[in-house]
Regions:
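Glycine-rich phosphate-binding loops that contact phosphosugars or nucleotide phosphates
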Residues: 12, 17-154
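Glycine-rich phosphate/diphosphate-binding loops that line cofactor/substrate pockets in enzymes
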Residues: 1-9
């Protein structure tokens, strides 16, 4: 309902998960499998000025929460990606999403970690190997893109 109601998808994570966020936001905004109308999505991992100023001025643990506070609105969807489920900045970003009335979802691995307490739905890749978890996150993200295109009647 997020997209159908004029909302957007905000994705965030660290390291390889940040790259996954950027990849998936691009698949949604530009195209996945076919030319179609855009799906509003943004990776909160792309603005180096916001990330470095935030890390310096308000602490790295708060960088995604602050961006969600500024850019999010009720009805949006925040997707946090963490291979461990333990990334405090991702957890705080998801909490902030819930606080503003947005939905909070998560992709993780390694048993899930505390992200499970703030994200629903919450997809846990049953592996302790970071590279396998990241590969599955991209696969899950591609499945999400395809499902959205079909559900929204865009392809």
């Amino acid at each position: 309902n997020c997209i159908q109601n004029g909302g957007k998808i905000m994705l965030f994570g660290n390291g390889g998960s940040a790259a996954d966020c950027q990849h998936l936001a691009t698949e949604l905004t530009i195209r996945y499998k076919a030319d179609r109308p855009t799906i509003a999505a943004i990776a909160l991992t792309t603005d180096t000025s916001a990330l470095t100023a935030g890390g310096n001025d308000i602490g790295f643990d708060n960088i995604f929460a602050r961006q969600v506070e500024a850019l999010g609105k009720p009805g949006d969807l925040a997707i946090g990606i963490s291979t461990s489920g333990n990334s405090e900045n991702v957890i705080r970003g998801l909490k902030q999403a819930r606080d503003i009335g947005a939905a909070a979802a998560g992709f993780c691995g390694k048993g899930g970690g505390p992200m499970a307490d703030v994200a629903a739905p919450y997809l846990v890749v049953p592996s302790n190997t970071t590279s396998r978890i990241q590969e599955m996150h991209i696969t899950l993200g591609h499945m999400l893109c395809g499902a959205l295109e079909i559900e929204l009647g865009l392809v």
